[in-house]
Amino acid sequence: MLSSNALNTLEFRAEDIPLSVYSLASSNKKAIGLTGEDLFRDFLLKKRNSGLILLKKVIWEDRNALFGKPALCLLGPKGKALNDFPKGQELRVGISTKYKELAKKYLNQLESKGYIFRKLAINGCCETAVTAGLVDLAIDIVYTGKSMQEAGLEVYDRVFTSDFVIIGSKRFWGGKNGFP
């Protein structure tokens, strides 16, 4: 992340970049940040009037990734599908806390089709929570799919695929100054 008139580079965890750019902009400091599109979209769902904008999308292409890039996915036991779970009966879903808002939005769409979910926020190891029987399904990022397969899970649905994004405050970067 860059801030101020002098060029300063600050390092934060990817999930903290949107809040950091927002906080700096709120303190009247010009800042940009590089993060995942999924994390940026999740932040915007929490803070709709943040004034943050996408300045540039950098396409993520990796042939080692299961879907070519990180994908937020609905995961469940291998050999089953979401349709195998009865509608109208509560299903426990472990949601990675990094993607809580994107996951809730997705699950709300499924609830409109008759599913009932108890949404449980989990700090990491969502796959293990399914394997241990703590939850029926999980929503987490899949990259290579290795940990998912090792846990005996498979992708039931892709919720969101993610690229890199450069973000900033509309106040500093929107329109008049532009972004190179």
Model-derived features with residue positions:
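Domain-level signature for soluble enzymes in the chorismate/prephenate branch of the shikimate pathway
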Residues: 1-180
